Amino acid sequence: CIINGEEVFTGTTTTQVIPHNHGHVLANVHLAGKAEMEAACEAAVNAQQAWIDIGLEGRCAIFERCADLLAGDWRMRVNAATMLNQSKTAFQAEIDSACELIDFWRFNCHYARGFHDDFQPLVSPEGVQNSTEIRPLEGFVLSITPFNFTSIAANLPSAPAIVGCTGLWKPSRNSYHSNYVLMQLMMEAGLPPGVINFLPGSGAEITEVALANPDFAGLHFTGSTAVFQGLWQEIGLALPNLRSYPRIVGETGGKDFVVAHPDCDRQGLLVALLRGAFEYQGQKCSAASRAYVPRSVWNAIRDDLVSEISKIKMGDARDFTNFMTAVIDQRAFDKISGY
């Protein structure tokens, strides 16, 4: 755990193993209990006024520094952590934990400045100065993040922070290690204590603690539809005890598809079907799980598609000839095996 800028060792631990090498323990993780979660809520609330006072430019400077660090000396470290923790190939790690997160931090700052600059009042009567101020939520934001994108995991707590919010970061149990490395990066970039509090632990417990706190102000979530619906219901039940109406932002799963036109680029379609369905073992919300292909096109590409699928190599993420590696855990393996 990292609470108010300090590492906390609770003594309640779990291990993080490499998905493609179960005998290799990657990290021993100290899990947050209710006491640590309550302390994190308090730290986030106490840190908010100073974080607001830094101003938008000060906050953007910190997260643009995060992007610079990730584009530089931290790039290989974060990519390696993602390769080992989530069993991503070097290519998948690079487009995720480096490229996408660098873009998140830089574009978020760009658009935050745009909100501030572009929506100022057009007219101020003589003797009056009208202005618009970006105000954060009054309280803390709970960010519950997924395993499958290291970039999204860091974006969920940091996007609200850029506009002045403080909060709790509950990482997925399958990506504690890589997410912890990014928390260290943000601290090195100058993130003040208490702005983001890193809490590996039970999702049910952290939700219970957060919703019991009157200062709960928002949820930022990426994960399954069922879990998100359950959280929404719990927030609704908690409303009488909260100081404000929480903002709820969530992204959930889908059944993505590929539609082919009779005049399509058939080689391009073949590549799209292969990469869309099989890269990162299909563990993406953007993974292709259905295809609608005209019979004439299907007859032309079917044999090539089957042939290319048979050539896909699976194994250790450190072997750059492998296109696929392991799925994230036993539960995912059992689900796939049951199809």
Predicted feature locations:
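A structured beta-alpha segment of the ubiquitous adenosine-cofactor-binding alpha/beta core
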Residues: 130-132, 197-220
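ALDH superfamily catalytic-core signature
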Residues: 185, 190, 212, 218, ...
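Short beta->alpha connector loops at strand-helix junctions that form conserved
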Residues: 170-172, 200, 262
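Hydrophobic/aromatic ligand-binding patch that stacks against planar heteroaromatic rings
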Residues: 159-161, 210, 240
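Conserved small-residue-rich beta-alpha loop and adjacent elements
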Residues: 118-193, 267
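Residue-level signal for inorganic ion chemistry
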Residues: 23, 44, 59, 164, ...
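Glycine-rich loop-to-alpha-helix module at the N-terminal edge of alpha/beta enzyme cores
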Residues: 22-116
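Hydrophobic face of amphipathic alpha-helices that form TPR/SEL1-like repeat modules
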Residues: 1-26
